[in-house]
Amino acid sequence: MLYLVPTPVGNLDDMTFRAIDTLNICDVVLTEDTRTSGKLLKHFNIDKPMWAFHAFNEHKALKSIIDHLHQGKNIALISDAGTPGISDPGFLLVRACVDEGIKISCLPGPTAFVPALVASGMTTDKFFFEGFLPHKKGRQTRLKFLADMPATIILYESPHRLVKCLEEIRDFIGET
């Protein structure tokens, strides 16, 4: 079975008991970055093999992981912070598991955008999660599309591009 296990976003005390128990029963933990995940696993005394699984190797690693799942291995997928598959690796693996009839268990847990949305004071009854905007090609087209969205828009952006992104959004949407 594939387990999608959310990890804390900034505070290790947010790790759930169920997430710890799940990681302990798995044969292997797929990690976005073994250094970051190694610290997390060590903190909770979880001694499991870690396999790197990230945007640069997920296509190549997919077949081997699916083979191990078909052999009955329990495999957990974690990201550096938050829920795997939300602007992190995981979609291709989940899709392959669905296509192959492999059971998936997705644990509830942290995502960065939910607390940010709730604490923003913006309307939460309708929102659109865009994730990361394209870096170059298609960025302006995407912003134009989002400008007409009748909902709160949620974007992810890296700290070093944040000011530029906010300026671009202001140019398309205006100051509201």
Listing of model-derived features with the role each one plays in the protein:
Residues 51-59, 130-136:
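Conserved helicase motor
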Residues 23-29, 102-104, 152-153:
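Short active-site oxyanion
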Residues 1-56:
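Glycine-rich, flexible N-terminal cofactor/catalytic loop recognition
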Residues 111-176:
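Beta-strand/loop-alpha-helix module characteristic of Rossmann-like adenine-cofactor folds
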Residues 71-129:
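Short glycine-cluster motifs
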Residues 9-12, 80-84, 159-161:
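Short glycine-rich anion-binding loops that position phosphate/pyrophosphate groups of nucleotides
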Residues 1-2, 72-76, 152:
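Loop/turn-to-beta-strand initiation segments
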